[in-house]
């Protein structure tokens, strides 16, 4: 075990607060109702802008779609027309169209494709079983009920990853907003007295990185902790 460096000792005095995100969802309104986008705001630790939509009874916050603007009229309901920002049932959306904030269960307010630049594609509708196949951002195809609702369009803020950080202070505040630690020094870049991966003529671990759970301390970057196996699985697996 390596010794605790000065920077690590200082960091242990501070408590990193967990990030608290506002739950984004839209209400259950069966009949077609008109709302208005009263504001588009930024939330800390969230890449996508948040649109505040005002309806007759209550306001809701949803991920802003590309092309949404302040003062835009939004229609919500089971039979709402297909337009950017409208909230309707997924069975009304044509095949091949991009949607976001897709519900996994009717009434949950949105589960899939809610981060910046993400969207789900409607693959096909199965009318005999009242189900719809969608392709989520990970590339996996899922089957949801055709009664689930969604927002038409692509979530805004897709170009946030194309913007370079340019300097370390920007990366520092980005990590701070998300409750992360920056910078994190690799173990192979340290000296042998500071980390078990340190030392050597060049940066190479040079020893097994799989360690027991008893040999590590909290929040220590040590390698593969208590791993049963490492590497790719070779050969067929017998059941």
From Swiss-Prot:
Its main location: cytoplasm. It is found in: Cytoplasm. Pfam families: Ribosomal_L2_C. Keywords: Cytoplasm, Ribonucleoprotein, Ribosomal protein, RNA-binding, rRNA-binding. It comes from the Eukaryota. InterPro entries: NA-bd_OB-fold, Rib_uL2_dom2, Ribosomal_uL2, Ribosomal_uL2_C, Ribosomal_uL2_CS, Ribosomal_uL2_dom3, Translation_prot_SH3-like_sf. GO terms for cellular component: cytosolic large ribosomal subunit. SUPFAM superfamilies: Nucleic acid-binding proteins, Translation proteins SH3-like domain. PROSITE patterns: RIBOSOMAL_L2 (PS00467). GO terms for molecular function: rRNA binding; structural constituent of ribosome. GO terms for biological process: cytoplasmic translation. PANTHER family: LARGE RIBOSOMAL SUBUNIT PROTEIN UL2 (PTHR13691:SF16), RIBOSOMAL PROTEIN L2 (PTHR13691). Belongs to the universal ribosomal protein uL2 family. This is Large ribosomal subunit protein uL2. The lineage of its organism: Eukaryota, Fungi, Fungi incertae sedis, Microsporidia, Unikaryonidae. The gene is RPL8.
